[in-house]
C-alpha cells in the first residue's frame, strides 16, 4: 500500500443513521480504464478493483458517480488525466464497436477508434504505462480461420479497418503496448441492446411470433469477465516481464451462429425454440461481416493466461434479470 484516503460511508444502527468518515487503503498498483461505463469496461474495472488494484474508470456519454468524465478526443484532458493519475496500466476499452454505426458515421468512428487510440498510446509511453488496446476479430476477412497473431489482417468492413488502423496507431506511438483482439461479447448488460448476443433474448422469449436468426456467420461468444481476467493477468505478467507486449488473441471456444446461440439461450431457460428460423444465406443488409474469424489463442495459453466461462452458464447469469416475469428486479438487483 502507498497511502490512505478518507471516504464517507453510511452506518446504520437501530434507530439511527450516521454519515461516517473512514480511512481506506489505496493499493499501490494503478490502472486506468477507458470506456469504463460500457459492457466490457465495467467488467475490466471490477476485475482490477477486486484484485487489489487502484482502479480509475473514465467514460463520456454514460459517465456516472465515481467515474471520471473525459472526452478522449480532447487531447489536453487526456494528458492531464494520465499525468495526474500516473497509472502503471491503461486498458483502452472505449470504441465505436457497432459496424453499421461506423459505416454511417465514419469520421466520428475514426476519430475515436484511431485518433484517440494513437494519442492515448503516446501519453502512456510518456509516463511508461503499459497500454492494452482492445481490438477485434473483425480485422480478418473470415475466409481462412483460425487466425494467429502473425496472420495478415484483411478487414471486410469499415469497423474492422478502424480497429486495425487503431492497432497501428497504438503500436507506432508506443512500442511497449499490447493489442488484444477479441470476438463478440456478452455479460451482465444494463439493457439487452448492449450486446449482439443478449439482444436476441426478447425474440427467444416471445415464442408466439416467429423470428429469423442468422445461421451463416460463425461466432465465438465470449464473456466480458473472461476478457477482463485476461487483461488483468496480462498486466500483472507485464509488470514482472517487460517482454510482454505486441498482439494477442482471446476468445471463447464454443462455435455458434446467432441461431445456435438463440437456441442455447432458450434451452438454458427451458423456453421453446421452435419459433426461431435459421437463415443460412449471407446477410445482404448492413456492413459486410466475416463468415468465420475464429481467433487462435495459443499464444496467451502458452503464457498461462486465460479464463473461459461455458456459454450456458454465462448467458444464464447474464440474462435471468431480463426474464419477462423478473424485469422488475433489474432496478433492485442488477
Swiss-Prot record:
GO terms (molecular function) for this protein are: enzyme binding; methionine adenosyltransferase regulator activity
Keyword Phosphoprotein applies: yes
* Gene Ontology terms: cellular component: methionine adenosyltransferase complex; nucleus
Q: Which gene encodes it?
A: Mat2b
Asked if the record carries the keyword Thylakoid, the reply is no
The task this protein performs is described as: Regulatory subunit of S-adenosylmethionine synthetase 2, an enzyme that catalyzes the formation of S-adenosylmethionine from methionine and ATP. Regulates MAT2A catalytic activity by changing its kinetic properties, increasing its affinity for L-methionine. Can bind NADP (in vitro).
Species lineage, top-down? Eukaryota, Metazoa, Chordata, Craniata, Vertebrata
The protein, known as: Methionine adenosyltransferase 2 subunit beta
- Which portions of the sequence form the region Required for interaction with MAT2A? 319-334
**One Pfam family per UniProt:** RmlD_sub_bind
Q: Name one GO biological process term.
A: one-carbon metabolic process
InterPro entries under this entry? dTDP_dehydrorham_reduct, NAD(P)-bd_dom_sf, RmlD-like-bd
User: At which residues is Phosphothreonine found?
Assistant: 309
Recorded metabolic or biological pathway in which this protein acts: Amino-acid biosynthesis; S-adenosyl-L-methionine biosynthesis; S-adenosyl-L-methionine from L-methionine: step 1/1
Q: Which UniProt keywords apply?
A: NADP, One-carbon metabolism, Phosphoprotein
Binding residue positions for NADP(+):
37-40, 60-62, 71-72, 93, 97, 159, 185
Q: Which family does it belong to?
A: Belongs to the dTDP-4-dehydrorhamnose reductase family. MAT2B subfamily.
- How does the record describe its quaternary structure? Heterotrimer; composed of a catalytic MAT2A homodimer that binds one regulatory MAT2B chain. Heterohexamer; composed of a central, catalytic MAT2A homotetramer flanked on either side by a regulatory MAT2B chain. NADP binding increases the affinity for MAT2A.
